[in-house]
A protein has these predicted regions:
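Active-site-adjacent betaalpha module
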Residues: 2-67, 99-102, 106-107, 134-326
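A short alpha/beta connector and helix-capping loop motif
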Residues: 64, 81-116
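Short hydrophobic beta-strand that contains or immediately precedes a catalytic carboxylate
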Residues: 69-71
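Active-site loop/turn elements of alpha/beta-hydrolase fold enzymes
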Residues: 73, 116, 286
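Short acidic, Gly/Ser-rich segments with clustered Asp/Glu that frequently serve as metal-coordination loops
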Residues: 74-81
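Glycine-rich, phosphate-binding/catalytic loops in enzymes
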Residues: 85-89, 129-130, 275-276
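Short catalytic/ligand-binding loop motif for oxyanion handling, primarily in non-cytosolic enzymes
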Residues: 120-123
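Charged, often glycine-rich, active-site loop that binds/positions anionic groups
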Residues: 125-137
Length: 326
């Protein structure tokens, strides 16, 4: 009997450089993609290396050039005080706490908390399409708007309407970004002044409590402490340059692991802008969630793996760290 396996040709090992001299990956048909960004094609990156299995291929990263970017896991999006039911965002929170955050800490991977945190000037400059996404206020046609710029501020006779202009089905405490959310009741019966919607340093824009405690501890670390960066659009990397991009460039960070809410909005918007700006993009598929239909999550996972970069899980991220090479 002929052993057919012995007659099959062996695939040769292939290697490649992808990119340009200033920003490139290496690829090996045996070991996958190397995203460690050595200074030149003839050199190797010094220091620790982590290999992580993604949905399609292994990737190897440099912890010192990587960041875990956790987006918008704030009270407004997750707290039951705003009527948020337990869902995909809360499940993602659990995966981050159990796997991704401890792994990032162990590896010395920087954790960036990228959150809505508007100033009064941001609200004034915000275009209508972005404002509409969070609802707005409307007044009776028999009423008059306040003259000048004040017309864009809240009016005593106004009501809250959703992004389609339909009055809210139940009384809403806020009427769009920058408006007061009123007093809310927490699960334990405590009342809290929620502050102005998505503006910096308000209760509604604070991190969801389980994560807030983690950030507070991480911000005190002597080496690679956690950082909190405000954003003023769905994407934290939109336009010419944002505070997030300035930080990434200052720290020499090139590889970004994305998590948070909502996958198909702020997480996805930041990821696609990062892709266009030349960053290495990895979506932690169970470290992010959305209130949109399942197809929205699936589309971002599909495109992250096939076009924008790579897709993996929080557990695979942690497994890679456990097997980290020095």
């Amino acid at each position: 009997m002929i052993n057919m396996s012995s007659t099959l040709p062996t695939e040769p090992h292939r290697k490649a450089f992808i990119g340009s001299a200033s920003n490139f990956w290496l690829h090996s048909s045996q070991t996958g993609f190397d995203l460690t960004h050595p200074s030149s094609p003839s050199e190797s990156t010094l220091g620790r290396r982590i290999t992580i299995q993604t949905t399609n291929t292994p990737i190897t990263i440099s912890p010192s050039k990587s960041a875990l970017v956790i987006i918008d896991m704030q009270n407004f999006f997750l707290s039951s005080a705003f009527g948020r039911q337990k869902g995909a965002g809360h499940a993602a929170c659990g995966q981050l706490i159990q796997h991704a955050i401890p792994a990032a800490r162990k590896a010395g991977i920087r954790i960036i908390w990228l959150n809505w945190g508007l100033s009064a000037q941001d609200v004034q400059n915000m275009p209508p399409a972005v404002k509409r996404a969070f609802g707005f206020f409307a007044i009776p046609t028999s009423s008059d708007f306040t003259p000048g710029d004040a017309a864009f501020g809240d009016h005593p006779s106004s009501i809250s309407v959703n992004k389609h202009g339909t009055p809210s089905s139940k009384a809403s405490a806020y009427k769009g970004v920058g408006t007061d959310c009123g007093t809310l009741t927490l699960d334990d019966g405590t009342q809290v002044a929620a502050g102005k919607l998505l503006m910096a340093d308000q209760w509604n824009s604070a991190l969801y409590p389980p994560l807030d405690a983690i950030y507070t501890a991480g911000a005190q670390l002597p080496s690679t402490p956690d950082v909190w960066i405000h954003k003023d659009r769905m994407s934290g990397l939109w336009g010419g340059k944002t505070a997030c991009e300035e930080f990434l460039q200052k720290e020499g960070i090139t590889t970004l692991f994305f998590a948070g809410v909502n996958t198909d909005q702020c997480v996805g918007g930041t990821l696609t802008d990062a892709f266009s700006k030349g960053y290495d993009c990895v979506l932690l598929r169970d470290g992010c969630g959305t209130t949109s239909p399942a197809c929205a999550q699936e589309a971002y996972e599909f495109n992250a793996a096939g076009t924008y970069g790579f897709c993996t899980s929080c557990a695979e991220f942690a497994k890679g760290v456990e097997e980290m090479k020095v």
